[in-house]
Amino acid sequence: YYERNIEGVSAAVTNQIPGDGRILVCYQPEKHSSAVLQEIRYDPATERCERTTLKTYDGFNAGNPEKVRQLFADAAELAPAQNYGLIIGCHGKAWIPVASGSLSYSMRRSAEDDLWAAPPGAKQTRSFGDKGYELNITELKEALEAQQFRFDYLIFDDCFMANIET
């Protein structure tokens, strides 16, 4: 799924794109054991789209807010720009927080108003990421606020989270 999305972006990067914009991708090709920060760009010398690894992260956990904060800082340092955009592609749990775990079969079949009710004492929030590597939206917010720049847009390409950013 993710590789296909990255290939789709790469197919759109041609010599017909004006300007000097840069596209960076953080991808975990080895499941959850590592990550790579890559740049997707058109190379006039080879006349094709190239993917170049800018940085490799060993033991990268996308569910760790500090690791995510550092990833954003690294991207800004390696590709300084006037404007930034962010697309997050992973699994999503919509309005269900990380601490809720997996939904049981009976919960999936509950009435709609029961399914989205927060547990007693829990903050209503959202999470995304694979089981054990999830990040709450509030943790993403903190990682974003720690940066010296702001993203111009944020898109979730996640199950259950399409259009949740609005």
Where do the PLM segments sit?
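N-terminal extension/subdomain marker
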Residues: 1-82
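Residue-identity detector for glycine
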Residues: 8, 19-21, 59, 63, ...
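Short, solvent-exposed loop/turn and secondary-structure capping segments
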Residues: 36-37, 96-102
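Catalytic cores of nucleophile-dependent amide-cleaving enzymes
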Residues: 87-96, 111-166
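Aromatic- and acidic-residue-enriched segments that line the glycan-binding/catalytic groove
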Residues: 101-112
